[in-house]
Regions:
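A substrate-engagement module of RecA-like helicase motors
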Residues: 1-75, 83, 131, 152-155, ...
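Structural recognition of the conserved hydrophobic beta-strand(s) that form the central parallel beta-sheet
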Residues: 77-78, 102-103, 292-295
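A structural signal for well-ordered alpha-helices, especially hydrophobic packing surfaces
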Residues: 137, 151, 155-158, 214, ...
Length: 336
């Protein structure tokens, strides 16, 4: 996904396949000249500098940035390059190093970290993928059908466990008081819910009956993507691949810090694996370096942020504002 954001091709292929890209094909034959030119010049490298060098030497700007970072004393980036389990800089943080982390606006990190370790999957993406494949049988279609059926049964179970009250139903979300005949159990049985109301069910245990068929989609989906790089449905199925990958990776991390949320809306079922407490994951990421300083103008109370960020032994320092009080001014408008 990041590759596509950095892509300098006028019509970049959505799959970002090296064999189809002139900037990626033969990359290592040209990267040394690009690095030499950059390192002999300015001491800082922004996106424009990377794009310019990438065009000049016909190399992928995304990979160029990664290789260049190993020659830099300071790397400035978004939280996810350290904390996100999918896109963190593996060349630096898959093992410990002599790094110093400076985390600005750290009051935003708890919510960002929860989002990074959580995942969401919608049943409709399976239905749309089957439709995009068209007619004919294939291993991928079989896997998609099995996963779609499992989520369909989960939707029925969800509605039966937590029927939506008709007073809260609108035209976009038809009444779901029952999708099954009375006293008929759904084909898929969900774990005992923590909470169930209005077509939403929360579970402590991950729903293995849904995750197993989603895992089974991965191999045939990857095979199809590799075999059909120019297919019209390639971009759509690539997004499905990422979504399946996200939810199955979240399932691998799933422990007592997570809950599962299932929500039925009309024909849709939304499966979410929600990380409620990211503290152990943030702590593990910070442990990849020698030390860390997390700072913000609103990082209070410190005891709360120590808890949610896993920094139980961290020292807290509060400083007075560097701005004179006379610089503050509050104006209340008069509204007639």
């Amino acid at each position: 996904r990041r590759q596509r954001q950095m892509c300098i091709r006028d019509r970049g292929h959505p799959a970002c396949l090296p064999e189809l890209c002139p900037y990626a094909n033969g990359y290592y034959d040209r990267i040394k000249d690009a690095l030499t030119a950059l390192l002999d010049g300015t001491g800082s490298f922004d996106r424009a500098a990377l794009a310019g060098a990438a065009k000049r030497f016909s190399v992928c700007p995304f990979e160029l940035g990664l290789d260049l970072s190993e020659w830099c004393d300071v790397v400035i980036g978004d939280y996810n390059y350290l904390f996100d389990p999918v896109v963190h800089l593996k060349r630096f943080f898959d093992s410990s190093g002599d790094w110093l982390f400076l985390v600005d606006e750290a009051h935003n990190l708890p919510d960002r970290a929860r989002a990074m370790y959580s995942a969401r999957f919608c049943k409709s993406s399976l239905t749309e993928a089957k439709r995009a494949l068209g007619k004919g049988k294939s291993a991928l279609k079989t896997a998609l059908t099995k996963a779609d059926k499992a989520l369909l049964e989960a939707r029925k179970a969800c509605v039966q466990l937590a029927p939506r009250h008709s007073s809260q139903t609108d035209a976009a979300d038809p009444a779901q008081t029952s999708l099954l005949p009375e006293n008929t159990a759904p084909a898929l049985e969900l774990p005992e819910p923590l909470y169930a109301q209005d077509s939403t069910v929360f579970l402590q245990e991950p729903p293995s009956a849904l995750l197993s068929p989603l895992r089974a989609v991965q191999a045939p989906l990857q095979d199809w993507l590799e075999a059909n790089p120019d297919a019209e449905a390639h971009a759509q199925l690539l997004e499905l691949y990422f979504a399946v990958q996200d939810i199955t990776r979240a399932a691998e991390r799933y422990d007592s810090h997570f809950v599962t949320q299932l929500t039925a809306r009309g024909r849709e079922l939304e499966l979410q694996l929600l990380c409620l407490d990211p503290a152990p994951f943030v702590d593990a990421s910070l442990a990849a370096g020698r030390s860390a300083a997390l700072f913000s103008a609103t990082l209070a109370p410190p005891s709360f942020y120590r808890s949610v960020l896993g920094c139980s032994d961290a020292r807290a320092v509060a400083l007075d504002s560097p701005f004179p009080v006379s610089y503050t001014h509050l104006t209340l408008p008069t509204i007639c």
